């Protein structure tokens, strides 16, 4: 199973990049949700503009699909500068990063997605560039090799990551601004869906937008993807106008339930309930029961279910909670299992 094959995957598909770019907000005034992040960035950007300085380096972290790339582009637009975009895996050698740094103009934004995947050699080049706006380059080889320093124009590095814990301390400490993006509430997602529908010339009422929002797992990227699929359903099975009923029919057909679960989420939870009496069960046994790899369970399926309170990890294995039994209308066994969660 590939995560990007799931309709409710938070990872971007290749074709989605072009569509998302067309509906992406370009200014903080258009940015929906994340009120704390938005307020802080308004202050930091206004202060930097007032001093006519480059904005301090910014680290943005949080789950995929919440708008890290969008925020990086907004920062560049608000500062009135250009943005150069790359990613950690692309910067294989120190020379790759050096080439990008030497092409920056004063105040420009360098956006590095998946910054936690930078190699140690590339990070070493980045440290003096971030701290002193200098680039150390080795010329020659062997005993004749020597280091020269090149001055760089002041610039802003914006790094994005879904796994902030994998950043090295020296790199993390060089970011003056650190922002965490949280999952969106239903109201903000409804606003995002309504805006996306307007920009895409899709007719939708507020109830229809809310029905999509509550099944979008708190993630704008998923919300916009579901909007496109519901639009298809509305155009073929109705008059093209998305109502709550049309959205409900479409999403039920797509097997996305009221909590945003798809067939894989349900299969995992039901296996724990029906085959293991709710747990505790080891991840290897669970993987065998649903014919999935251990990594798929740990990295793709579990995080959302744990965060939403449908399952927990304990020293004895995985267990479902009472929420899972209620969701499927199953009476939990009277064994006091939840009292033993932390034994």
From Swiss-Prot:
A GO CC term attached to the entry: Holliday junction resolvase complex
Family matches, as InterPro entries: AAA+_ATPase, AAA_lid_4, DNA_helicase_Holl-junc_RuvB, P-loop_NTPase, RuvB-like_N, RuvB_C, WH-like_DNA-bd_sf, WH_DNA-bd_sf
Residues engaged in binding Mg(2+): 69
Region of interest called Head domain (RuvB-H), as start-end residue ranges on this chain: 258-343
Annotated spans, Large ATPase domain (RuvB-L): 4-184
A Pfam family hit: RuvB_C
Chief location category: cytoplasm
GO biological process: DNA recombination; DNA repair
Residues at which DNA binds: 294, 313, 318
GO MF entries: ATP binding; ATP hydrolysis activity; four-way junction DNA binding; four-way junction helicase activity
Subcellular location: Cytoplasm
Reaction(s) catalysed by this chain's protein: ATP + H2O = ADP + phosphate + H(+)
Keywords from the named record: ATP-binding, Cytoplasm, DNA damage, DNA recombination, DNA repair, DNA-binding, Hydrolase, Nucleotide-binding
Bilayer-spanning residue ranges: none
Primary enzyme class: hydrolase
Small ATPAse domain (RuvB-S): annotated segments: 185-255
Binding-site residues for ATP, renumbered to this chain: 23-24, 65, 68-70, 131-133, 174, 184, 221
EC numbers for this chain: 3.6.4.-
Signal peptide location: none
Function text: The RuvA-RuvB-RuvC complex processes Holliday junction (HJ) DNA during genetic recombination and DNA repair, while the RuvA-RuvB complex plays an important role in the rescue of blocked DNA replication forks via replication fork reversal (RFR). RuvA specifically binds to HJ cruciform DNA, conferring on it an open structure. The RuvB hexamer acts as an ATP-dependent pump, pulling dsDNA into and through the RuvAB complex. RuvB forms 2 homohexamers on either side of HJ DNA bound by 1 or 2 RuvA tetramers; 4 subunits per hexamer contact DNA at a time.
HAMAP family in UniProt: DNA_HJ_migration_RuvB
Record-stated family: Belongs to the RuvB family.
Subunit structure: Homohexamer. Forms an RuvA(8)-RuvB(12)-Holliday junction (HJ) complex. HJ DNA is sandwiched between 2 RuvA tetramers; dsDNA enters through RuvA and exits via RuvB. An RuvB hexamer assembles on each DNA strand where it exits the tetramer. Each RuvB hexamer is contacted by two RuvA subunits (via domain III) on 2 adjacent RuvB subunits; this complex drives branch migration. In the full resolvosome a probable DNA-RuvA(4)-RuvB(12)-RuvC(2) complex forms which resolves the HJ.
Domain observations: Has 3 domains, the large (RuvB-L) and small ATPase (RuvB-S) domains and the C-terminal head (RuvB-H) domain. The head domain binds DNA, while the ATPase domains jointly bind ATP, ADP or are empty depending on the state of the subunit in the translocation cycle. During a single DNA translocation step the structure of each domain remains the same, but their relative positions change.
Protein name as catalogued: Holliday junction branch migration complex subunit RuvB
Lineage: Bacteria, Pseudomonadati, Pseudomonadota, Gammaproteobacteria, Pseudomonadales
